[in-house]
Amino acid sequence: MGRGRGKRVVRKLKLQIPGGQANPAPPVGPALGQAQVNIGEFVRQFNDATRDRMGQLIPVEITVYEDRSFTFVTKTPPAAFLLKQAAGVEKGSGEPNRSAAGRVSRAQVEEIARTKMPDLNAADVEAAVKIIEGTARSMGIKVEQ
């Protein structure tokens, strides 16, 4: 049996928006406006979908179709965002090898790895932990064993 043709994809957008706090102001409005998407509808749907992750930075992939309809997929927050939250710092170190920006425990790194598992290219949690530790190292955040 042949597969029916779906709607034609016109554009794919990737944005990072705080959970439950999307609004038509930049960067959301202009990006969606250029793609001719109903901005109000996206904002409402996104805020409903991310209400439980209020304040977290949520990467979202928006697929726009030729009839101006859209679908979106939310991802897990960036590892850097989760590490900064766990370490209680505003930003990573300007010179990661010289000065430490903060500290996180191995347990915190494992928790972040479990959260990020769906979006990481890792076979198991141990591999995911190594990826997160590498991100922490590049930000100047020390991982304590």
Curated annotation (Swiss-Prot):
Pfam family, one: Ribosomal_L11
Translocase recorded as keyword: no
SMART domains documented for this protein: RL11
Any one annotated GO CC term: cytosolic large ribosomal subunit
Modifications after synthesis and translation: One or more lysine residues are methylated.
Taxonomy, superkingdom: Bacteria
Keywords for the protein's UniProt record, in alphabetical order: Methylation, Ribonucleoprotein, Ribosomal protein, RNA-binding, rRNA-binding
InterPro entries: Ribosomal_uL11, Ribosomal_uL11_bac-typ, Ribosomal_uL11_C, Ribosomal_uL11_C_sf, Ribosomal_uL11_CS, Ribosomal_uL11_N, Ribosomal_uL11_N_sf
GO biological process: translation
Role: Forms part of the ribosomal stalk which helps the ribosome interact with GTP-bound translation factors.
Quaternary structure, from the entry: Part of the ribosomal stalk of the 50S ribosomal subunit. Interacts with L10 and the large rRNA to form the base of the stalk. L10 forms an elongated spine to which L12 dimers bind in a sequential fashion forming a multimeric L10(L12)X complex.
Homology family: Belongs to the universal ribosomal protein uL11 family.
Stated name of the protein: Large ribosomal subunit protein uL11
Organism: Rubrobacter xylanophilus (strain DSM 9941 / JCM 11954 / NBRC 16129 / PRD-1)
Source organism phylogeny: Bacteria, Bacillati, Actinomycetota, Rubrobacteria, Rubrobacterales
